[in-house]
């Protein structure tokens, strides 16, 4: 009987932990959804989303909207209504990226969380930026806040693969893009008077423009630049234009640069 009682007790603990994990992942997925709304507007900063819950419901949420502007945590805390402000002292904030701990273009979010008396923080992944890199988590813990890390870490890392690569590997994140036929034909050798072979459809063209809006720069070879003088701008999607880079053996400037 004692063994049966022990098994029941263990099962209850397992069920409770599973339910907590499901809740954490539910709100972190919402935070990820919010973070994506900043795509194309926050670079070189990362996309970040934040959700605040209390008594089983969301009382505030926000995301980093624009480079140099308020961070996700600030927008989430500011979104809490006056009638719900008293719930902050028993709330949990879910953030896709470790809250910052330094003064940059904005004050540290970790300090704001502490000053707002939020007792629980759930973090998707640590910030690899050298000015943060675990310091935000330590600041929260030293203030007596319960901190959980690594919830949907893979998804949170992938969200900011450009930012993560830059700070973890100290190099740019590079995507190779080209168009070819099913039999691997790309283009013929031609001169400036001849038009290039076109494979792109309206759908793939829109996808390319979406990708352009998500990157800081586009690089092409000097021959492509001379033959086609591509604008490399964002036209079929919203977002800012990337910088144009031409690689060649001699100095070369695109028209309109």
Q: Locations of the language-model features?
A:
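Cysteine-centered motifs
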Residues: 4-6
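Zinc-dependent deaminase
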Residues: 12-41, 58, 84-85, 103-257
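A structural motif shared across PLP-dependent enzymes of the aminotransferase-like
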Residues: 40-43, 47, 68-71
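Short beta-strand scaffold segments in enzyme catalytic cores
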Residues: 48-56, 178-179
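Short glycine-/small-residue motifs
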Residues: 61
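A short, polar/charged loop-to-alpha-helix boundary motif
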Residues: 65-78, 199-205
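Mobile, glycine- and charge-enriched loop segments
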Residues: 77-103, 253-254
């Amino acid at each position: 009987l004692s063994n049966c009682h022990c098994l029941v007790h263990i099962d209850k603990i397992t069920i409770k932990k599973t339910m907590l994990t499901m809740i954490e992942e539910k709100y972190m997925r919402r935070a990820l959804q919010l973070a994506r709304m900043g795509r194309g507007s926050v670079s070189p900063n990362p996309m970040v989303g934040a959700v605040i819950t209390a008594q089983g419901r969301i009382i505030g949420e926000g995301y980093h909207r624009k480079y140099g502007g308020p961070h996700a945590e600030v927008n989430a805390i500011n979104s809490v209504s006056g009638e719900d402000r008293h719930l902050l002292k028993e709330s949990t904030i879910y953030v896709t990226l470790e809250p910052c701990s330094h003064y940059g273009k904005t004050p540290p979010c970790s300090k704001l969380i502490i000053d707002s008396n939020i007792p629980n923080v759930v973090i998707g992944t640590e910030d690899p930026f050298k000015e943060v890199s675990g310091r935000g988590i330590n600041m929260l813990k030293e203030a007596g806040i319960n901190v959980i890390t690594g919830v949907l870490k893979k998804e949170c890392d992938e969200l900011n693969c450009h930012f993560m690569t830059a700070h973890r590997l100290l190099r740019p994140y590079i995507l190779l893009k080209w168009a070819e036929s099913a039999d691997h034909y790309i283009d013929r050798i031609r001169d400036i008077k001849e038009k290039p072979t076109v494979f792109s459809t309206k759908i793939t063209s829109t996808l390319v423009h979406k990708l352009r809006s998500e990157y800081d720069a586009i690089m092409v070879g000097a021959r492509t630049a001379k033959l086609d003088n591509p604008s490399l701008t964002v036209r079929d999607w919203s977002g800012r234009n990337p910088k144009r880079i031409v690689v060649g053996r001699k100095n070369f400037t695109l028209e309109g640069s």
